[in-house]
UniProtKB/Swiss-Prot annotation:
Gene name tied to this protein: acpP
Name of the protein described by the UniProt record: Acyl carrier protein
NCBIfam families, per database record: acyl_carrier, PRK00982.1-2, PRK00982.1-3, PRK00982.1-4, PRK00982.1-5
Keyword Ribonucleoprotein (UniProt): no
Family: Belongs to the acyl carrier protein (ACP) family.
Length: 77
């Protein structure tokens, strides 16, 4: 797993209180990991802070899964 994926996974586990084993590429933050809309906003903010990037609102709406987050951040970093 890449450094980006490891860091994203750590943020997801800490913010959503889920087991690391449940955070897989196609795991939906809302459907699979129990996040609500506020959680997803907080995740995006945490990703922005951790990786020193800005995620525009329209892009944030497309980040629905762990894999989406890793892909976006990898391309933006």
């Amino acid at each position: 797993m890449s450094d980006v994926a490891d860091r994203v996974k750590k943020i997801v586990v800490e913010h959503l209180g889920v087991e690391e084993s449940k955070v897989v590429e196609n795991a939906s933050f809302i459907d699979d990991l129990g996040a609500d809309s506020l959680d997803t906003v907080e995740l995006v903010m945490a990703f922005e802070e951790e990786f020193s990037i800005e995620i525009p609102d329209d892009a944030a709406e497309t980040i629905q899964t762990f894999g989406d987050a890793v892909k976006f951040i990898s391309e933006a970093s």
